[in-house]
């Protein structure tokens, strides 16, 4: 049985180098998937395959049981929204104007409430009239996240919950805003949006994701519930570091480098 988004033996090669090798994934509607792995593992390439930006050199990617490359660009844009890791805007747009870009050519009366809601959701209500280049990197990242939220929600009016793809969305954010953004992504998933996010922080992934997909050297190394992946000894080999598993008070497992764990004060018995 197919999922909302499927990769079937999907591979991608360029210049004789295989960046992804026979990736099989079934992602159901409303799942929040975190993709983790060391640098160069193929995470961004996989996200671009799943978004339809890249075509697999072998295998297939399908969205709602239809080859993702069979969608016309405008049709695909109304069904999925993607936040890239680095977005450069050199023109002096205001924050609100950037967020409005997510609405495309839809009328202002139709989408103003979506823009207002997105600005509020990312905590930029008071920044709407600021020029984007005057903001910090983290604030700019939040503005672009609001933009893709508007794009996603405009598409929902036509097609129902869509696909949200996030490439290192927390890379420029402080801890508070990392948690806020991850919480927003989780709420999107609970409302039916299918969310796929590349994260460097596997503990953040364990806290918010339904599943963690681990890539290593272009191959699928693990795919499962956060607790299964965190507690799998394979994760130490993938990241090539000594890690220990600990459990938070609410039962969620997390990883610590062994040298940090050894330095923690031991509780008195």
Curated annotation (Swiss-Prot):
S-S bridge residues: none
Domain ABC transporter per the UniProt entry, residue ranges: 5-242
Keyword line: ATP-binding, Cell inner membrane, Cell membrane, Membrane, Nucleotide-binding, Translocase, Transport
SUPFAM superfamilies to which the protein is assigned, alphabetical: P-loop containing nucleoside triphosphate hydrolases (SSF52540)
GO function terms (MF aspect): ATP binding; ATP hydrolysis activity
Membrane-topology annotation of the record: Peripheral membrane protein
TM region(s), chain numbering: none
Superkingdom to which the source organism belongs: Bacteria
GO cellular component, one term: plasma membrane
InterPro entries, sorted: AAA+_ATPase, ABC_transporter-like_ATP-bd, P-loop_NTPase
Subcellular location field: Cell inner membrane
Main location class: membrane
Keyword Phosphoprotein: no
Gene3D superfamilies according to UniProt: P-loop containing nucleotide triphosphate hydrolases (3.40.50.300)
Assembly and interaction partners: The complex is composed of two ATP-binding proteins (HmuV), two transmembrane proteins (HmuU) and a solute-binding protein (HmuT).
Stated name of the protein: Hemin import ATP-binding protein HmuV
Gene assigned in the entry: hmuV
């Amino acid at each position: 049985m197919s999922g909302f988004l499927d990769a079937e033996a999907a591979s991608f090669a360029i210049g004789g180098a295989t960046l992804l090798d026979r990736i099989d994934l079934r992602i159901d509607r409303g799942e929040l998937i975190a993709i983790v792995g060391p640098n160069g593992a193929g995470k961004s390439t996989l996200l671009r395959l799943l978004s339809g930006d890249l075509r697999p050199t072998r295998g297939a990617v399908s969205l709602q049981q239809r080859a993702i490359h069979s969608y016309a660009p405008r049709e695909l844009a109304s069904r999925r929204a993607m936040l890239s890791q680095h977005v450069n805007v050199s023109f002096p747009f205001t924050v609100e104007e950037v967020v409005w870009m997510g609405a495309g050519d839809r009328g202002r009366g139709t989408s103003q409430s979506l823009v207002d809601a997105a600005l509020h959701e990312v905590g930029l209500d008071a920044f709407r009239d600021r020029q984007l280049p005057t903001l910090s990197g983290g604030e700019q990242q939040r503005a672009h996240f609001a933009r893709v939220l508007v794009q996603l929600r405009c598409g929902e009016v036509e097609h129902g919950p869509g696909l949200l793809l996030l490439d290192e969305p927390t890379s420029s954010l402080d801890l508070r805003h990392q948690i806020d953004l991850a919480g927003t992504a989780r709420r999107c998933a609970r409302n039916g949006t299918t969310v796929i996010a590349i994260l460097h922080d596997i503990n953040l992934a364990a806290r918010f994701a339904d599943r963690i997909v681990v890539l290593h050297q272009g191959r699928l190394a693990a795919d499962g519930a956060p607790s299964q992946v965190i507690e799998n000894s394979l994760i130490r080999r993938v990241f090539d570091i000594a890690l220990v598993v600990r459990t938070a008070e609410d039962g969620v497992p997390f990883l610590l480098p062994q040298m940090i764990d050894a330095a923690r004060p031991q509780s008195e018995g």
